[in-house]
Amino acid sequence: MEPDGTYEPGFVGIRFCQECNNMLYPKEDKENRILLYACRNCDYQQEADNSCIYVNKITHEVDELTQIIADVSQDPTLPRTEDHPCQKCGHKEAVFFQSHSARAEDAMRLYYVCTAPHCGHRWTE
């Protein structure tokens, strides 16, 4: 990004809103047939200098997801259960979440993480 807030031609990185600093997303202006970058948080948008869009999809396995967030068992926003005790240490409480996997076979699978401080065992049922 240049000091004046513009991007060099052909820039393919992430763009940010000049109003609220959120990420800008590609958006088509169908009436004028141009590509825009628009903020999903406010009304800011800017015309793209290049009509090329690159998509980089990254998928993660549940083990990767729970290791990325080392303190997932301490997350107060995750639901907890005592109906699925840890098979490794016997602790009764676990947090659980549904993976955002795109694979159809994982669509409704729940993943559990033991909340015992010394354990952190991860499993699915």
Curated annotation (Swiss-Prot):
A zinc finger (C4-type) spans 17-42. Zn(2+) 2 binds at residues 86, 89, 114, 119. GO terms for molecular function: DNA-directed RNA polymerase activity; nucleic acid binding; zinc ion binding. Keywords: Acetylation, DNA-directed RNA polymerase, Metal-binding, Nucleus, Transcription, Zinc, Zinc-finger. Zn(2+) 1 binds at residues 17, 20, 39, 42. It holds the Pfam family Zn_ribbon_TFIIS. CDD domains: Zn-ribbon_RPB9. It is found in: Nucleus, Nucleolus. Gene3D superfamilies: 2.20.25.10. InterPro entries: DNA-dir_RNA_pol-M_15_CS, Rpa12/Rpb9/Rpc10/TFS, Zn_ribbon_RPB9, Zn_ribbon_RPB9_C, Znf_TFIIS. One of its GO terms (cellular component) is nucleolus. It comes from the Eukaryota. GO terms for biological process: maintenance of transcriptional fidelity during transcription elongation by RNA polymerase II; transcription by RNA polymerase II; transcription initiation at RNA polymerase II promoter; transcription-coupled nucleotide-excision repair. The modification N-acetylmethionine is found at residue 1. A zinc finger (TFIIS-type) spans 82-124. Belongs to the archaeal RpoM/eukaryotic RPA12/RPB9/RPC11 RNA polymerase family. PANTHER family: DNA-DIRECTED RNA POLYMERASE, DNA-DIRECTED RNA POLYMERASE II SUBUNIT RPB9. DNA-dependent RNA polymerase catalyzes the transcription of DNA into RNA using the four ribonucleoside triphosphates as substrates. Component of RNA polymerase II which synthesizes mRNA precursors and many functional non-coding RNAs. Pol II is the central component of the basal RNA polymerase II transcription machinery. It is composed of mobile elements that move relative to each other. RPB9 is part of the upper jaw surrounding the central large cleft and thought to grab the incoming DNA template. Component of the RNA polymerase II (Pol II) complex consisting of 12 subunits. This is DNA-directed RNA polymerase II subunit RPB9. The lineage of its organism: Eukaryota, Metazoa, Chordata, Craniata, Vertebrata.
